[in-house]
Every structure is written in structure tokens, then in C-alpha cells.
């Protein structure tokens, strides 16, 4: 595993993080997760997730033949604030043991292939995922080991869309790695 998480210092010697703000040309990003990439849990890590050629090979592979194949779901999704497991310890100090990260998403293309995929996820929802939002891709070379649940939601109203409602969750002290999306 090649996670690229920050190195946390021991003791009270930690320095303040470095920030960057531009009063004249702020770098802001819009919301919405619009695609989730999914691979079998046993699939091999990507060699370099920032390279389009690496993604092209994995996306072209047949998932019925290799666990290294990556598929994607077009979604309307969000990643709300992670839920932190904060514990108070001696001398009125606090630590974060872990965070529970969640992606809530809807799949609005509910054809037979996507319905079969929903049913396959119900066999056991542990996968490696990456997600894209705006100009960024999240997940690193390893992907995010996440548990996915998906449900078919048929509305009462005739003019409403039938959607698959999904939730992906994982535990991590850190938010996932982020990179400019090479597929845009």
C-alpha cells in the first residue's frame, strides 16, 4: 500500500500548516460528485493515478475477466462533513481516533445492466473506489477501500425518476488524496 498521508509529529513540536489565499484570483471549486470509479477489492493498485494512460488501460479491461478492471457510475453525489470520533483524554486534551467518511449518491440511469450491477453490489459491498468532483479526482494509487450500499427507489409520483440511492462509507483519519483529474 502506498498511501500518501501527512506525517504527524509527536509531542508538542508540530508546526502550523501552510495555507495559500489569493485576494485577486481566488481558487474555488464547485460542488457535486458526478462519477464514482469502482474496482474489486482484490484489484491491484494503480501504477500512477495521475496518468491518463494508466486509467485508459484499467477502464478498457473486462470486469468479468480481471479483478483489476475499473468501472464507473455516473452519479449525482455529495460528500458531507466526515463524522469524527473525538475522545477526551487526560488533562482536558482531545484526540481524533478516526473519521467516518460518506458519499451519498443517486444513479439516475436505471437500465437492466445498472440494475444487475446494483444486485451484484448486494453480494458484498466492499470495493476500492475513486470519485471525481469538478476538476479533481480523489483516491490515490490505492483507491479508497469503501463499503457501498445501493437501493432501488421507485417513487409514488409518475413524473418522478426511479433512481438507485447509494451510500459509500470508509474509515480514515485523513481525507483521501486529491489530484487534478487526468480524464478531464
For every predicted segment, state its role.
Residues 138-184:
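Mixed-charge, glycine-accented linear interaction segment located at domain edges/termini
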Residues 90-112, 159-175:
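Oligomerization/assembly interface segments of phage tail-like spikes and tubes
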Residues 2-102, 144-159:
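Solvent-exposed edge beta-strands and adjacent loop segments
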Residues 19-21, 105, 127, 147, ...:
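Phenylalanine-focused residue identity feature
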Residues 24, 41, 108-112, 132-134, ...:
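Generic structural motif
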Residues 115-139:
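Short, acidic/charged, Gly/Pro-enriched secondary-structure junctions
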Residues 112-115, 152-153:
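Short alpha-helical segments and helix-capping/turn motifs at coil-helix boundaries
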Amino acid at each position: 500500500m502506498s498511501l500518501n498521508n501527512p506525517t504527524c509529529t509527536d509531542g508538542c513540536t508540530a508546526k502550523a500548516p501552510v495555507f495559500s489565499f489569493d485576494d485577486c484570483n481566488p481558487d474555488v471549486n464547485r460542488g457535486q460528485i458526478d462519477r464514482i470509479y469502482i474496482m474489486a477489492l482484490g484489484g491491484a493498485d494503480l501504477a500512477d493515478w495521475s496518468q491518463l494512460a494508466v486509467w485508459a488501460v484499467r477502464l478498457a479491461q473486462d470486469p468479468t475477466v480481471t479483478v483489476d478492471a475499473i468501472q464507473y457510475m455516473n452519479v449525482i453525489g455529495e460528500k458531507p462533513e466526515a463524522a469524527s470520533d473525538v475522545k477526551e483524554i487526560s488533562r482536558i486534551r482531545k484526540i481524533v481516533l478516526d473519521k467516518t467518511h460518506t458519499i451519498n449518491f443517486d444513479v439516475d440511469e436505471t437500465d437492466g445492466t445498472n440494475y444487475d450491477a446494483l444486485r451484484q453490489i448486494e453480494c458484498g459491498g466492499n470495493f476500492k473506489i475513486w470519485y471525481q468532483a469538478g476538476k479533481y479526482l480523489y483516491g490515490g494509487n490505492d483507491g479508497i477501500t469503501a463499503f457501498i450500499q445501493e437501493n432501488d427507489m421507485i417513487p409514488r409520483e409518475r413524473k418522478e425518476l426511479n433512481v438507485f440511492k447509494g451510500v459509500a462509507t470508509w474509515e480514515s483519519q485523513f481525507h483521501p488524496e486529491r489530484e487534478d483529474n487526468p480524464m478531464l
